[in-house]
Amino acid sequence: MAKLRNIMLLCLCALMAVPALRADHLTIIAVNDTHSQIDPTSDGKGGVARRRAIYDKLRAQNPNTVLIHAGDAVQGTLFFSLYRGEVEYALMDTLGYDAIILGNHEFDNGMEELAAHYRDVDAVKISTNYDFSATPLDGLFQPYWVKAVGDKRVAFFGINVNPEGLISGSNCENLRYLDAPDVADATARYLKEVQHVDYAIMVSHIGYSSYEPSEPNDTLIIGHSHYIDMVISSHSHTTIKPGGGMDRISNADGKMIPIGQNGKSGKLVATYDLDLESGDIVYNHITVDESWDEAASRYTAMNTWLDNYRHGVDSIMNNPVASSTRFMKNSSDAIQNWVSDATMEIITEVSGIKNIDCAIMNKGGIRTDMPKGTVTEGLIGSMFPFDNRFVVLEMPGTELIESLKLMCGRGGDAVSKELKATYNKKGELVKATIKGKKIDPNKTYIVATIDYLANGGDYMTPMTRCKRLFTDSQKYGNHILEYVKRLEAAGKKIDAKDEVRIKEL
């Protein structure tokens, strides 16, 4: 009997020495809008090796862990401009993503290229409200994914943004969009009542808030939902601080639903600790900074592989071409003014059209900050990475006014110094002038812009009804690069004022 007691004690001690598997908890790791930020940003945050160190530590703490990417893994640095997704999609498997959804920028090189990359990605690819049946992406996606943890089942489904007005039509041809609000709660209900899952989690790329007021967002969907238990948000680049008040939204039944998002560029990693018994969810952020460098340095094979691509990026990134008098954040009025005024000068020269009235650009097309001091070729390439062309439109005054109404409704866009507008607290256009004169609906105006807007991007439908007088053959970023080189050769620096050209009264 004593011998049996000793054996039982030894077994008990052995069991106590083994860390308990948290079968009652699921750890969900999520990132969004990492935008090809392979290495740390200029402020020292982010980087894929650091993120991998975070992922691996969390997985070691709880084997019941899933890793999610909520879209826009690509576009925004030279890694994508030069290598067209080769780096980012290969890293999906290296970092061990379990499930991914599409952002709008995944379409930037068209669906043929995207399909070629996605065939080699092991992660489950989820899309609930896109019908790919008539596209090259057919067969690569599933509407939801269920993760079993013990006797509990957790479902993830993906809600994608309306491509109209946001994705170039040629890049999403034959893609059928299903209305996000209708699909979201219906899917969650189906998962619970038919598939009998315990939790339904929406992974979304429509935004915490709407860029275009007529489009839905995550808060609207939660507000009309009865069945969604949690939302992993993206697209709007919102940093939803844990415990800051934005991370819980009341649903249709008055229940507070957790929602999280990490800004952009992979500077933060979100964690959601789901108690599978109680349903409680604890949302948190981990900062991706230098404290992870030691752990990140251990990924020798990955870092060596990345160095093969870094050489090409660095050769461009380190080539100085101009200088700037000041720092300008990519969302600032100053950089929007500089880009729009530069556009006026450039298009007037390359088109030969001398009577251009104003320039209209999209503020979302300026992807990085302008530093004070040295400006490199790589920085200009990263700032303007898109494959868009300058165009000149002949716009009736009525269409220009309609365009300005849209711009005012979202807080303004980038316009040249000739154009000024004001709007009220409701976002309604009050007054618009060109060179100090009120815009006449009966007059025709010559407007410089880019083909993305002229094709209806950023919901600029009025521009699609206008006659094109000129379409350039080069990427507009190439023209801006040559423009800043000319400034430098003339002894001039990049500079702009903080003037608000479309402002609220």
Spans of features found by a protein language model:
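Bacterial N-terminal signal peptides that target proteins for export
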Residues: 1-8
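Bacterial N-terminal signal peptides
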Residues: 9-17
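Acidic, metal/ion-coordinating pockets
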Residues: 22-289, 339-345, 356-359, 390, ...
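Feature captures C-terminal
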Residues: 25-27, 37-46, 50, 122-129, ...
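Short, solvent-exposed aromatic-acidic interface loops
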Residues: 283-296, 435-437
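Glycine-rich phosphate/diphosphate-binding loops and the adjacent beta-loop-alpha structural elements
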Residues: 312-334
